[in-house]
C-alpha cells in the first residue's frame, strides 16, 4: 500500500485579522501547531509616496510624511525637514529646535503607549488599551493645539516649525508629565509581573545582537538585544546633545525585553519633555521658531499687510516654492519604531529629484520568518506585536 505523504497546512493570517495591525497578510505554513514558514505579503497599502513627492515642492511634500507612520506623524516630518535644511544649508533657531524635540518625544510616547497596550491586547489583556488611549487622547489634543490637526499635523517645515506654541500650551504639557508617569506605573504593575503576560512573551522571538545587525534592525529591536544604539545619542541632531536622558537596553532580545525597553523609553521621553518645557518657559521663552530666511520660511501675516516684498515672498513660496541647491543628503532620526531615514536628491529645481524613504518597519517585517520559525501559531501575534509594525511606512 502506497504511503500518503504528509504535507504542511497553509493558512492565511490577515489582512482582516484584528491582530494583523492594519493590512498585513501572512501566509503561514504549519506542521500541527508549529510554524514552519512565514511569508509576509506586503503592498496592500502602497500609495506611491516616493513618486508623488517628486511632483511636489519641498513644502508640499511635508504632508505625505505624516501618512507613513501615522502613530507618530511629526517624527517622520522631522527627518524630511532635516534633509531639506542640510541641502539648503540653514539652521533652525534654538526655540524651534526645542519645540521639535518636545513634539518628537510626544510622538514617541504616543507610539509606544499604543504599541505596549495593543501588544498586551494581542496576548489577551483587555484593560491596558483602555488605559493607554486615555493618555494618548491628551497627547492628540497637544498636537491639535499646536498645529490644528490631531494626526496629520504638517507642523515641522523645512526651516523650523509652522507656528510658535502659546505659553499656556507649554505649561499644560508640563502639568501632564507627572500624572502620566503615575499611569505608566499603574500599567507597569498590571503587566510587568503578570504571570500570563510573561508566559506569552518571555523567550519568544529571540534575536541575538549579531542577527539584529545582520537583518538591518534599528530602534527598540536592537536595544532589546543589548546594544545601546540610539541616534539621539550616537548621531545627535537638533539639541538632543544638550538633553540628559538614558538609553534602556534589554538582555535577552525577546518580546518581553522589547516591552520593558519601550516602557522605560516612555519614562525617558517624559524626562526629555520636562527639560524642554523648562527651557521653553525659562531661558528660551522668546525668539524665532523658524529660520529668518524669507526665501524659505513664509513671512508673518502682519509683515504681509505692510510690505510688498513680504507679500511677493509669500506668494512665490506657496506657488512655486524655493529652489534647493543640487546635491544629495541622507538624514535619519530616531523614530519610535527605529531609524527613519530620508535620502533626498536635489537637481537644483524647486522639486525633489528623488526622495527615498527608509522605513524601520520594513526591515523588521522581513525577519518574521526568521523570528517565528519553530514557535507555536499563537506566538505569531506576540512576535508581531513586539515588532511594532505600521503599514503606512512599510508599504509607503
Swiss-Prot record:
InterPro entries: NADH_Q_OxRdtase_suD, NADH_UbQ_OxRdtase_49kDa_CS, NDH1_su_D/H, NiFe-Hase_large. Coiled coil: none annotated. Pfam families: Complex1_49kDa (PF00346). GO terms for molecular function: NAD binding; NADH:ubiquinone reductase (non-electrogenic) activity; quinone binding. It is a peripheral membrane protein. GO terms for cellular component: plasma membrane. It is found in: Cell inner membrane. The keyword Zinc does not apply. Its EC number is 7.1.1.-. Its main location: membrane. Keywords: Cell inner membrane, Cell membrane, Membrane, NAD, Quinone, Translocase, Transport, Ubiquinone. It is an enzyme of class 7 (translocase). It catalyses: a quinone + NADH + 5 H(+)(in) = a quinol + NAD(+) + 4 H(+)(out). Belongs to the complex I 49 kDa subunit family. NDH-1 shuttles electrons from NADH, via FMN and iron-sulfur (Fe-S) centers, to quinones in the respiratory chain. The immediate electron acceptor for the enzyme in this species is believed to be ubiquinone. Couples the redox reaction to proton translocation (for every two electrons transferred, four hydrogen ions are translocated across the cytoplasmic membrane), and thus conserves the redox energy in a proton gradient. NDH-1 is composed of 14 different subunits. Subunits NuoB, C, D, E, F, and G constitute the peripheral sector of the complex. This is NADH-quinone oxidoreductase subunit D. The gene is nuoD.
